[in-house]
Amino acid sequence: MLTNIIILIILYLFYDFCYKNFKYRNYGSPWALPVIGHFIHVINQPHLVVHNDRMKYNNGRFVNYWFGDYLSIAITDPILYKKIYLNFPKQINSRLKSPTVLNISERFRGIISSNENNWDFHHGILSKLFNGHKAKINNFLFEKETKFIIEYMKKISKSGENFDTRSNFLYFYSNILFDYILGKRVENIYENELRKDRKKFMVSIQEVMDSVGLIKFLNYLILSYPFLSIYLRYFTYTTFNLKKILKQYYDEHLETIDLNKPRDVLDNLIMEYKNQNAIECDKSFVAIAIELLAAGTDTNSSTSEWFLTYLVNNPIYQDKIYDELIGALKINKPLKGSDVLINLSHRPLTPLFNATLKEVLRLIPATPFSVPRMSNEGFEVDGIKIPKGTYLFPSMYSIFRDEKYWGENANKFYPERFLTDSHSNNYFPYGVGKRMCLGSNFSQHELYICLTNIVLNFKIKSIDGKPLNEIPNYGITFRPNIFEVKLENR
C-alpha cells in the first residue's frame, strides 16, 4: 500500500513537472519545479527577479511563471500591458479567488478584490464619491490636514528634534481617509496618545493585506484550500478584530444617519444600498473599508517617504522646487483664510514639482506589481494565447525602468524627462483600463497639497549629512528603510 502511494506521488510529481514546463514551452520561462512551480525562483526580491528574467524571455514583453497550480504571466512591456487591459476588460475582470481573499473581502465584496458583479455596483457608488463635485470637499480635507502636519513639523524644527517620516505620514494619510470614509478624524494625531490606537489599527490592516501578497504559497495551491480556510476561520484574530471594529462603526452610522445629509463615504454607501434594495451592506462596507484604508494610506505614505528621500539626496532639486513654489505664489496669491499657501490652483505653475513627483513614482512605483487579474475566459493578443484561469500581474517596476522606453538613464533620477515629454504611452502609475485605481485623482491631489507645502516651509536634510538609502524593501508596497530627517524652517 505504502509503495503504491509513493509510486503515485512520484508519477504525479513527474506529470506536474512535465505539464508546467512543456505545456506552454513556446513561451520562454525558467524551469518550474513540480507542485510549487517558481516560488523558490522568485522568493527573494521578486521585482528584481522578474526584471532580470524579462531580458531572457519573450523579447522583454512578458515572462511565464507557475505559482502553485496557477499559470502566471508577468507583463513587463507597457504596450502589451495596455493592449491586454484596454482591449480585453471583460476577459480579465476577475481576481484570484483564494481562501485568504475570500476571508478578507467577505466573499469578494470589496472594491479591489471584488468579483465581477460586486465591482460594477461598488465602483458606481465610490467613483461618484472620489471624483466629480466631491473633489472640492476632498481638497478641503487635504488642506486642513496639511495645515496640522505643517504646524507639527514647525514645532519639531524649533525643538531640534528629528521628523519621523514613517509614523507621521501614516498618521497624515490615515487621518484624511478615516475622516472621509468614517468621519473619525483624530485631533492632534501627531502628538495625541490616541495615535497609538490608530497606528495599531493601520498595522493590523497592513498585516491583513500582506497575507494576500504575491508570494504567499498556499493561496495558489488548490489542495490546501480546505485547510487554509479552516485556519483562517478559526485561528487568525487580526482579520476578526478588524472586522469587529469596522462593524461597530457601521452600527453607529446606521443609528445616527440623516438620509438628507450624508456625512461620509459610509453614509453614502448605506443610502445607495437602501435605494437599490441591496442586502448585507455591513459586510460590503467592512471589505471596502479595509481595502480603501490599506491602499490609500500605505501607498501615499510610502510615496511621500520616497519623495523626501530623493529630495534629501538631490538638494539642488529641493532648492529649485522651492523657488518654483515662491514664483507660483507671486503669480497666484493664496486665498484669504486658506489653511495652506499652495493649493491645487497652483498646479499648472509648478511643472518641476509635478515632474519630480512623477519621477519618484516612476523609479519607485507605489506597488511593485499592479493588483493582479485572473482571466475568466481565454483570449489571444499579439499571437500570445492566454488561457482561462491565468494569473496576470503587470510588473510596474520593470515597465517604468525599461531602457527601450526610458533611455539609457532609465535607472537614474532625472525629473527633467517629464518636462519635455509626458510619456503618456508608457507611464501610468495608477493603472489602465476598467479597473484602474478609482482614487487616482484623490491620491494625486493629497500628495500635491501635502508635499508642496512641506517643501515651501522646510529645508529637508538627513540627520547625519549622508545620502539616504534608495534601495526599496519589497512588499505590497515599496518601503524605504525607516528614517528620520532634519527640518529647517525656510
From Swiss-Prot:
EC numbers: 1.14.-.-
Q: Which residues bind heme?
A: C437
Write out the transmembrane intervals. 2-22
Cite a GO CC annotation: membrane
Under the heading InterPro entries, the entry gives:
Cyt_P450, Cyt_P450_E_grp-I, Cyt_P450_sf, Cytochrome_P450_fam2
Q: Tell me its cofactors.
A: heme
- Principal localization reads membrane
Location of the protein in the cell: Membrane
* Superkingdom: Eukaryota
Check the record and name the SUPFAM superfamilies matching this protein: Cytochrome P450
Keywords per UniProt? Heme, Iron, Membrane, Metal-binding, Monooxygenase, Oxidoreductase, Transmembrane, Transmembrane helix
Q: A GO molecular-function term, please?
A: heme binding
**What membrane topology does the annotation report for this chain?**
Single-pass membrane protein
Please tell me whether the keyword Oxidoreductase is annotated for this protein: yes
Query: What family is this protein classified in?
Result: Belongs to the cytochrome P450 family.
The protein's name in its UniProt record: Probable cytochrome P450 518B1
Naturally occurring in which organism (per UniProt): Dictyostelium discoideum
